[in-house]
């Protein structure tokens, strides 16, 4: 039993980080302190200043741990890392970093590529972001490829390597073909530099250059080239058309402000580069209404700039706690001095007020959509509860399906819906291991037994403190199981649950002859559901999703098997070489088209095996 009185007495009067845990050993809050003894004690003292959120959190604390650091700055850095690791329930969090796209430029390569990435790696690449609108980022990438003749292939191209035949993109002027030595490393670097400048908001020089080239082409009667350059100018303007000139001070500055309602907050960021607003992003922080605004902004800065690709010289905010400490931390992140400023007058405060207005509008729009969606989901779950005779709505629903073609590459899938919404982070896939041929019943038995047996084992490990709650992949059980199938499939599921001494209701999702969702079977009775009801729409969506997820995994396994079976017939190609070829080229078609030199770039492929591959696919060409 954790002795709170004793542990609070022995807390050190030093800086550090504290971790609050619940009865399941789950880390529910991470915080930093200049003096651990003073800060941690505050949570367990009666105070009117405690928000409702803090009171609820404290009621769930079963124990706490702490880590001593040499300074408050070290505590801040450690706090950021631990929050990123545990994603604690009561910390103010942005969506998982994986949800936000970045634009990545591989400037560490001889001939860099430009594409969308979900993560930042310390690989020497240049990143822009994070952005919240994936479709807008994708459109920007497509426009960049229209403006600049850069490569879109995934091949690794070295400067000075033997030239190969360019692809179609070169012939339609979408690529400068470094693979065929049609452009030097230095010439390609100039193109990449223009892209970096454009994404940084420095478009004036690019537009001037394109306009001069267009005039030269027009004067020399090269009208087709002039028209192409005109289109590129339009594309550049489309990328920058939302950029608004605001001030004469050419600084790299971010403006952060916040709007709140009775439940949630919206933090809006405006990015200013060279006197122009080059972009803005918003972040909805749910259940933060009782937090102080200056605290939310401080937490946001740690989370946002902890994963941001760029830290500006100046950050403007309406108010903030730990200002000087955060300035030091941002300075470390940037590599040069960063200031956090609270403007009181002039154009800076005017822009900050504009950011707040946008945050308020965004929050209102979010709330309207959220309430509409929430109402629909709640109605659907309420209808489903009535149909099944439940006292409470099923908060977590897990659905299962099996996919194979004539018993080959059998797979199972599990999708999860919480409060009516899909929760993709909890989706799981199963490769059938013990069943031969096409036997859906035995396959379903296998995946359900594996899923719930693993869940029981994880719960036991969590109870023994050998596993952190947040690390468990199967430890959360559903309120309802839906099986893609009829009575037979449902009975198989019930048998497995009975074997494991687990009580969870199971229903089957049945389809008619045209493969359209018809209804559900529960307690061996098919329930009549109106096709227009919200419950039917939810069931149909779940059934379509679990089927899609199973089919996609089945196709992946099938494609890998087909690739391997073809490569098995090539002399001198063993298991290791086969894996290396698939890793480098990805498809049989790419391997077929590869030159001897390209094949030799593959680890473990020597001249003899490269010749074997070429002879196998094109014996008449050697």
From Swiss-Prot:
GO cellular component, one term: cytoplasm
Domain UVR: 204-239
Cell compartment(s), UniProt: Cytoplasm
A Pfam family this chain is assigned to: UVR
GO molecular function, one term: DNA binding
SUPFAM superfamilies in alphabetical order: C-terminal UvrC-binding domain of UvrB, GIY-YIG endonuclease, RuvA domain 2-like
Annotated GO biological process: nucleotide-excision repair; SOS response
Gene3D superfamilies xrefs: 5' to 3' exonuclease, C-terminal subdomain, GIY-YIG endonuclease, UVR domain, UvrC, RNAse H endonuclease domain
Keyword Cytoplasm: yes
DNA repair among keywords: yes
Domain GIY-YIG as annotated: residue spans: 13-92
PANTHER family from the UniProt entry: UVRABC SYSTEM PROTEIN C, UVRC/OXIDOREDUCTASE
Name of this chain's protein: UvrABC system protein C
Designated gene of the protein: uvrC
